[in-house]
Amino acid sequence: MSEFSQTVPELVAWARKNDFSISLPVDRLSFLLAVATLNGERLDGEMSEGELVDAFRHVSDAFEQTSETIGVRANNAINDMVRQRLLNRFTSEQAEGNAIYRLTPLGIGITDYYIRQREFSTLRLSMQLSIVAGELKRAADAAAEGGDEFHWHRNVYAPLKYSVAEIFDSIDLTQRIMDEQQQQVKDDIAQLLNKDWRAAISSCELLLSETSGTLRELQDTLEAAGDKLQANLLRIQDATMTHDDLHVVDRLVFDLQSKLDRIISWGQQSIDLWIGYDRHVHKFIRTAIDMDKNRVFAQRLRQSVQTYFDDPWALTYANADRLLDMRDEEMALRDDEVTGEFPPDLEYEEFNEIREQLAAIIEEQLAIYKTRQTPLDLGLVVREYLAQYPRARHFDVARIVIDQAVRLGVAQADFTGLPAKWQPINDYGAKVQAHVIDKY
C-alpha cells in the first residue's frame, strides 16, 4: 500500500516542463463562464466551434467591443483557452474543420468556483455530511473486521481517501467562500454607510442578519454531525494500532481528524469575528445618530441666527426659576433638561472630581473601624452615608463607600459559603448584600 506524493522541487519541475500558465482578463473569464453555462444546458457536454463563436459574440457585445473582427478575436480566444488547458479540442479526419470542444477539469474547476460554489445551501451541506457519515461508518466496520492488505486498501483506505477527504475539502472550500462573502458584505456595508447612513440602516441590518444566519446554519450543521464523524475516525484509528504495516491509513485518519477539527474550529471563530463586526457596525450607527442629532441642532440654530433679520423669531422657555437657580442642591436631577447633553469628557471630569473628594473623606472616616478593630456592618454604614446626600448621588456614594470598605479587610463569614442577608440602604428600595467585615 503506497500513497502518491511529490516533493516541492518535483512539482516545480513538472509545472515548468509543461509550461503551465493561466491568464484570464475579465473578458476572457466572462467568455469561459458563458461557455460553461451553455455547456451545462447540453446533454452531451460537447460544443462546436460555431457555438463557441456565438458565445464569444454575446460577451463581445456586453463589453461593447467592435463586431468587425469578431471572427478573428473569437478564434484567438478559443486557441488561448486550448493552450491554457481550459478547453480540449477534438478533430476528426472525416469531419475536417468541425472540431468538438469540451471543458477540461481545470476549466470546470474555475467555472464551478464562480458559478456553482457561490451558493450556500444547508441542504447540500447536510447531504455531504450524510454521505461522509455513511462512508466513515462502513470504513470503521471494515476496520473492525480486519483482513489482508487488499481488504484495508479497498474497504478502508479508498473510501477515506477518495470520498471522505474530497467532501471535507469541499466543505473547507465552502467555508473559504463564506470568508470572501463576509468581506464583500463588509465592503457593501462600508459603501452604504459612506453614502447615506440613514437610508443604509435597514440595508445594513439585512446584510448583517443574513450573513449571521448563514454562518450559524453552517456551524450548527457541522457541529451536529461532528461528534459522530470523530467517533468513527477514532474507531478506525484504534483498529490500526495493532497493525504495524498500516501507517498510511493511520496517517490519513490523523489528517482527516485535523481537517475536521479545523473546519469546526474555524466555523465557530468565524461566527465570533462576525459578532464583533456586527457590534462595531451598530456602535458606529449609534455614534452617527448621536453626532447627527447634535449637528442638526447646531445647524438649525446657526441658520436661525443668520436669518434672524429676514425671519425674526422669539425664544420661549419654561420653568424660569429652575433655569436661574443654578445653586439648587437638587439640580443634578435636571442637568440634562437645563443644560442639554454634556460632552463625555466633562461628565467624566465632574464625576471624577466628586469621587476623589468623597473617597478621601470616606477613607479617613472608615479607617477608625480598622484602628479600633470594630466590626464594620456595610448595610448600616452605607445607610448612614446615603442619608447625608440627595437621592441622585446615592448610587455613586454607595459604590465609593463599598469600594473603600472592602479595602480595609474581609468578612470571615464569606468563607462559610452562606449568603448574607439583604439590607435596605435607603428609602427608595436600594439594598445591599454583604457580611460584616471583622478581619482587617
Curated annotation (Swiss-Prot):
GO terms for molecular function: calcium ion binding. Keywords: Calcium, Cell cycle, Cell division, Chromosome partition, Cytoplasm, DNA condensation. InterPro entries: Chromosome_partition_MukF (IPR005582), MukF_C (IPR033441), MukF_C_sf (IPR038198), MukF_M (IPR033440), MukF_M_sp (IPR036141), MukF_WHTH (IPR033439), WH-like_DNA-bd_sf (IPR036388), WH_DNA-bd_sf (IPR036390). One of its GO terms (biological process) is chromosome segregation. It is found in: Cytoplasm, Nucleoid. Gene3D superfamilies: Chromosome partition protein MukF, middle domain, MukF, C-terminal domain, Winged helix-like DNA-binding domain superfamily/Winged helix DNA-binding domain. Pfam families: KicB, MukF_C, MukF_M. GO terms for cellular component: cytoplasm; nucleoid. Residues 208-236 are annotated as: Leucine-zipper. Its main location: cytoplasm. Involved in chromosome condensation, segregation and cell cycle progression. May participate in facilitating chromosome segregation by condensation DNA from both sides of a centrally located replisome during cell division. Not required for mini-F plasmid partitioning. Probably acts via its interaction with MukB and MukE. Overexpression results in anucleate cells. It has a calcium binding activity. Interacts, and probably forms a ternary complex, with MukE and MukB via its C-terminal region. The complex formation is stimulated by calcium or magnesium. It is required for an interaction between MukE and MukB. Belongs to the MukF family. This is Chromosome partition protein MukF. The lineage of its organism: Bacteria, Pseudomonadati, Pseudomonadota, Gammaproteobacteria, Enterobacterales.
